[in-house]
Amino acid sequence: MKERVFLDTNVLVYLFDADDPAKQRCVQDLLSNRELWARLILSTQVLQEFYVSVTRKLATPLDPEAAFQAVQDLAAFPVVQIDPSLILLAIQRSRKAKVSFWDALILEAALAAGATLLYSEDF
């Protein structure tokens, strides 16, 4: 069985960030591998953060309708639902490993989905 691959929010945001062409190209190269698509996993946190980031945090933000369509497209991939048990695990990991809660939650979602590879700029 091929490894499952979890994408952090920042990876997806760079796909739409024309102000950072080097990172944008890196993500385009990564996602040009169609074989990878069958192994991708996201989480509800990733979808939420993605929408906010591409509509509010980019120098040239996406219009809300384009961002909605992007989230709708991303939601076609397997999506880990963030539930109270993952939140509690993330709190524990964040305290023990001294990482941000949000990064710990990404990691817990990836682990819950059985991901063996996590793409992020935060780890």
Indicate where each model-derived feature is located.
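Active-site-proximal, substrate-binding regions of enzyme catalytic domains
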Residues: 45, 51-78
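Active-site neighborhoods of divalent-metal-dependent phosphate/nucleic-acid chemistry enzymes
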Residues: 3, 77-121
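Acidic active-site catalytic centers that drive phospho-/nucleotidyl reactions
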Residues: 8-10, 49, 103, 122
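Hydrophobic side chains within alpha-helical segments
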Residues: 11-13, 52, 86, 106
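Alpha-helix N-cap/helix-start and coil->helix boundary motif
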Residues: 12, 47-48, 87, 112
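Alpha-helix C-capping/helix-to-loop hinge sites
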Residues: 15, 33-37, 53-57, 74-78, ...
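Short secondary-structure boundary segments
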Residues: 44, 120-123
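Short, well-structured N-terminal submotif of metal-dependent ribonuclease cores
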Residues: 1-42, 57-65
